[in-house]
Amino acid sequence: VATVQGLSGTGSLRNLGLYAERQIGMFSFTGLNK
């Protein structure tokens, strides 16, 4: 659901990064996004 909302929003990449970071935990997309 979070991913769908992210794609609908302007910050899709940001939301996907946060979601992926929670799921994976190993990678930090938010750090790369800074």
UniProtKB/Swiss-Prot annotation:
Q: Which reaction does it catalyse?
A: L-aspartate + 2-oxoglutarate = oxaloacetate + L-glutamate
* Keywords per UniProt: Aminotransferase, Pyridoxal phosphate, Transferase
- List the cofactors: pyridoxal 5'-phosphate
Superkingdom as given in the UniProt entry: Eukaryota
**Where along the sequence do coiled-coil regions lie?**
none
Q: Does the keyword Transferase apply?
A: yes
E.C. number(s) listed in UniProt: 2.6.1.1
GO terms assigned for molecular function: L-aspartate:2-oxoglutarate aminotransferase activity
Similarity section: Belongs to the class-I pyridoxal-phosphate-dependent aminotransferase family.
What is this protein for, i.e. what is its function? Important for the metabolism of amino acids and Krebs-cycle related organic acids. In plants, it is involved in nitrogen metabolism and in aspects of carbon and energy metabolism.
Q: What else is known?
A: In eukaryotes there are cytoplasmic, mitochondrial and chloroplastic isozymes.
What is the annotated quaternary arrangement, including any partners? Homodimer.
Q: What name does the UniProt record give this protein?
A: Aspartate aminotransferase 2
Name the species this protein comes from. Answer: Pseudotsuga menziesii (Douglas-fir)
